[in-house]
Amino acid sequence: MRKWIAGLVVLTTALIAAVPTAGASSTTCTGELAPGSYHKLIVPEGAVCGTEAGPVTIRGGLYVRAGATFVLGSEENPVHTGTIRGGVHAANAMSVQIHFSTISGGVRIRGGSGPFGGPFGVTWNTLEDNVINGSVWMTGYTGFWEGFFRNIVHGSVNYNDNTLVDPDGNEVQSNTIHGNLNCSGNDPAPQQGDSQGSPNVVTGQKTGQCSGV
């Protein structure tokens, strides 16, 4: 599943997408995200926003609304792509995919918008090869697939109640977590899957469904 998903990450959206709102305190993104610096970045309901290239700096937090898709970076382009301060906040988003970035302020990805739809036909969340300063919450996702790979997290990771269509989903591997790794209520249970990853290194405790990964 990992190889198939990686080949799908091609944005097919408008070329002009980042539109500053009143006072330029926030930017609404509905297509290709141009390299540059932004304050608060908002992906509105049902929109698609992203870039595989960068570099992008977000200083006031990233907010992904219901049914929206956000992509930053690519597994095939292993260079530092983004810096996000103020955290990542997603509520019932369709897909959130962040690669090779530094995130300060933690990650809160809650809920989903079902397994099918959006620019890729199927939905998935993945956080890969990031440095995350702050706790991570990935909870209640109802997409097709979800993964969490090779991240360095300065805080605890809470991975709960994610129900996926793909039996190879909920792959949580090769992370270094300076805190606890807490997992419960996921279907399927967090696993290696076909990722060829390694067990997570956790300085705190591994609890629940993640006690063996």
Label every PLM stretch briefly.
Residues 44, 59, 65, 73, ...:
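Feature marks extracellular polysaccharide-active and adherence modules
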